[in-house]
């Protein structure tokens, strides 16, 4: 198995281990984060109904404008601020953070810090 495949398997193991323990509710939805090499995505998910309450990513025009590259910490900070703004518009102030198996470092940490600075608590 290649080293890339080993990393992917390890991330999926971390993801399932964490997902067993956390769930989102209407009062406190799950803030799910996914990152690829070029983009970062965030969703607020109510696990009782399986519905996405709000989402933000670097694919959206308002987040991506002014960025020369969308796969860095600056872009993750903008996505964190955008998801916090959308959550506050829907009167959601508390969330459960789901790092989706990714290490809490770099872009994931930047997104979480920006969401906290803009009004979300977790």
From Swiss-Prot:
Keywords: Ribonucleoprotein, Ribosomal protein, RNA-binding, rRNA-binding. One of its GO terms (biological process) is translation. CDD domains: Ribosomal_L18_L5e. GO terms for molecular function: 5S rRNA binding; structural constituent of ribosome. This is one of the proteins that bind and probably mediate the attachment of the 5S RNA into the large ribosomal subunit, where it forms part of the central protuberance. Belongs to the universal ribosomal protein uL18 family. This is Large ribosomal subunit protein uL18. It comes from Geobacter sp. (strain M21).
């Amino acid at each position: 198995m290649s080293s890339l495949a080993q990393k992917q398997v390890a991330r999926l193991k971390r993801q399932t281990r964490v997902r067993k323990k956390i769930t989102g509710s209407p009062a406190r939805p799950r803030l799910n984060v996914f990152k690829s090499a070029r983009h970062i995505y965030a969703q607020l998910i109510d696990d009782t109904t399986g519905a996405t309450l709000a989402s933000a990513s670097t694919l959206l025009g308002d987040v991506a404008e002014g960025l020369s590259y969308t796969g860095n910490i600056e872009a993750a900070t903008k996505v964190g601020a955008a998801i916090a703004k959308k959550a506050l518009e829907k009167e959601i102030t508390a969330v459960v953070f789901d790092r989706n198996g990714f290490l809490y470092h770099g872009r994931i940490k930047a997104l979480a810090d920006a969401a906290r600075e803009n009004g979300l608590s977790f």
